[in-house]
């Protein structure tokens, strides 16, 4: 009926952090099973990420300055031990990527080409050729050379297994066969990305649904700062053919690269300089409130007033902005045409609370990448996301191996839990009068989140949103129905996703209600001030009840 596969290390997630964790664990001699929701190296956020990765490689720069810039960019909310680990390890992990086959843009003398991004005191963004896909492909090639890894894709994890308070593996659904199986492991690493798909306008892939984060919460994981969602200012909102494409404003506005402008609906420049993402997002929000936004609620980027010649612009657009050619295919030439953009959900700053070694509050459970919550704080600096995947993927892999070496075999009886999942799936397949498909329920949830938990929040809107989410879970979720087929029934995956999304939406809203201040990407109309002392919002599930608290930000160990 079901299989139990044994591993020393179970890695959940096939993006940059998960693959890096699996590589480290396998190189340390552990038997590794990696579960990925989609095809490895072509799923999740990593393959669609931009080309920037941060590392202090230039003369005059240092890991100490990288640390200081990141702490400042996080608006006081980044845990300093984690930031220190990120800054100290990033260069070594970049060299690892080169050894795996990743290619970087280089200067004529062979040094790394870099660019300056908002918040950096030194030019620190390196360029991976091929962007996130180039990174993912190099990791995948390295992974395939290691003999002690079992890769299972088209697998959606249903439940984390906890025995005697320790992580013991997971139950997953094989989408290809429709069968439910178990991985029993001495330690587990969760690296499943963010939850941007809670909102309808995002530049991330549709599998960034966050149900794995809800699953970790149900298992007892300590979550932190879930209200902090980074809205990237520069995502195409019109024309429809390009909606959701990220166009890096850091290149557009950089006077040394493209020297562009940002204009409101009246054609006026409304922000100058080189703003950080949260500052830019708030400026766009102000244009919307004043009625001076572009027709679709955003702004325009304009290169027609650039000080550079058309020839120089062409060379730089082709070299620095891969979206240039894509936009031309849908009728937009950035040299001649204004492009309408708006803020979109781009990166989840909240997630599982970890220490600098990727350890969570559950013994044997480790986490890395965007699923974690206390690395960047209330705003993330460009390029640190890909660095984070490699630094903390490696650290979590190392620590998981140390734990597994000391852990005994975790025997268990899983039949009852597996049968429970078959019953759930069969209930969805049975069909219901007036049944609701997963995609319909997802759209309704996204509408709620956009209306009540968007760029601007207040107590009334958040409470209204919470009531709507609870109503959807109580009245609509029981009507969920999927196609009555077993093999490759992706509606079953979507059903599990929306079930987890509803759970996650509730605790995101509870966290937003608890943070009675404005900080970074969290803006409260009723609490526009920023508190003098930064704090984390912490939420845990204790005996079936949500326990919310404020906890201090971790300072750097001396």
Task: Please place each PLM-identified region on the residue numbering.
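Glycine- and aromatic-enriched mobile tails/lids
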Residues: 1, 5, 16, 24, ...
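Core beta-strand elements of the Rossmann-like FAD/NAD(P) dinucleotide-binding domain
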Residues: 4-7, 178-187, 361
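Short beta-strand "acidic-cap" motif of Rossmann-like dinucleotide-binding folds
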Residues: 30-36, 224-225
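Conserved N-terminal glycine-rich FAD pyrophosphate-binding loop of Rossmann-like flavoproteins
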Residues: 38-69, 75, 230-236, 241-246
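Helix-loop-beta segment of a Rossmann-like dinucleotide-binding subdomain
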Residues: 76-80, 111-136, 196-200, 299-312
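Conserved redox-cofactor binding core of oxidoreductases
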Residues: 93-179, 191, 232-241
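Glycine-rich loop(s) and the adjacent beta-strand/alpha-helix scaffold that form part
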Residues: 187-242, 379-399
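An anion/pyrophosphate-binding glycine-rich loop and adjacent beta-alpha core
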Residues: 215, 221-333, 337, 390, ...
């Amino acid at each position: 009926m079901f299989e139990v596969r044994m591993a020393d290390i179970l890695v959940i997630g096939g993006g940059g952090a998960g693959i890096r964790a699996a590589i480290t664990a396998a190189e340390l001699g552990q038997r590794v099973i990696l579960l990925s929701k989609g095809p490895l190296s072509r799923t999740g956020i990593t393959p669609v990420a931009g080309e920037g990765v941060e590392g202090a490689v230039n003369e005059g720069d240092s890991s100490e300055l990288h640390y200081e810039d990141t702490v400042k960019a996080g608006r006081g909310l980044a845990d300093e031990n984690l930031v220190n680990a990120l800054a100290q390890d990033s260069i070594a992990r970049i060299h690892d990527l080169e050894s795996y086959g990743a290619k970087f843009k280089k200067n004529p003398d062979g040094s790394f080409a870099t660019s300056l991004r908002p918040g950096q005191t030194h030019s620190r963004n390196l360029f991976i050729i091929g962007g996130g896909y180039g990174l993912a492909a190099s990791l995948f090639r390295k992974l395939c050379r290691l003999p002690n890894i079992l890769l299972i894709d088209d697998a959606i994890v249903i439940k984390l297994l906890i025995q005697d308070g320790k992580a013991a593996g997971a139950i997953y659904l094989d989408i290809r066969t429709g069968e439910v199986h178990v991985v029993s492991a001495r330690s587990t690493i969760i690296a499943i990305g963010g939850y941007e798909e809670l909102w309808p306008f995002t530049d991330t892939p549709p599998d960034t649904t966050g149900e794995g984060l809800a699953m970790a919460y149900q298992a007892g994981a300590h979550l932190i700062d879930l209200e902090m969602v980074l809205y990237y200012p520069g995502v195409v909102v019109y024309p429809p053919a390009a909606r959701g494409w990220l166009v890096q404003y850091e290149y557009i506005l950089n006077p040394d690269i493209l020297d562009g402008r940002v204009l409101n609906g009246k054609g006026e420049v409304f922000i100058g300089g080189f703003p950080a993402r949260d500052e830019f997002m708030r400026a766009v929000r102000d244009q919307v409130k004043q009625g001076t936004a572009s027709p679709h609620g955003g702004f325009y980027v304009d290169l027609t007033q650039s000080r550079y010649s058309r020839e120089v612009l062409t060379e730089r657009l082709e070299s620095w902005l891969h979206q240039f050619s894509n936009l031309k295919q849908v009728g937009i030439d950035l040299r001649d045409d204004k492009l309408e953009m708006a803020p979109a959900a781009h990166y989840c700053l909240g997630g599982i609370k970890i220490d600098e070694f990727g350890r969570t509050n559950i013994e044997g459970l480790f986490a890395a990448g965007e699923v974690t919550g206390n690395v960047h704080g209330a705003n993330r600096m460009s390029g640190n996301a890909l660095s984070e995947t490699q630094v903390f993927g490696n650290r979590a892999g190392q620590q998981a191996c140390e734990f597994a070496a000391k852990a005994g075999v975790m025997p268990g009886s899983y039949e009852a839990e597996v049968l429970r999942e078959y019953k759930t799936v069969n209930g969805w397949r049975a069909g219901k009068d007036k049944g609701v498909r997963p995609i319909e329920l997802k759209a309704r949830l996204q509408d709620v989140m956009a209306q009540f938990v968007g760029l601007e929040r207040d107590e009334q809107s958040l409470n209204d949103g919470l009531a709507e989410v609870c109503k959807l879970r109580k009245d609509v979720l029981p009507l969920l129905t999927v196609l009555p087929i077993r093999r490759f029934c992706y509606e079953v995956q979507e059903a599990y996703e929306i079930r987890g999304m509803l759970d996650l939406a509730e605790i995101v809203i509870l966290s937003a209600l608890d943070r009675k201040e404005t900080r970074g990407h969290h803006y409260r109309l009723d609490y526009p001030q920023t508190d003098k002392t930064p704090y984390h919002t912490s939420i845990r599930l204790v005996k079936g009840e949500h326990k919310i608290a404020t906890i201090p930000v971790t300072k750097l160990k001396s």
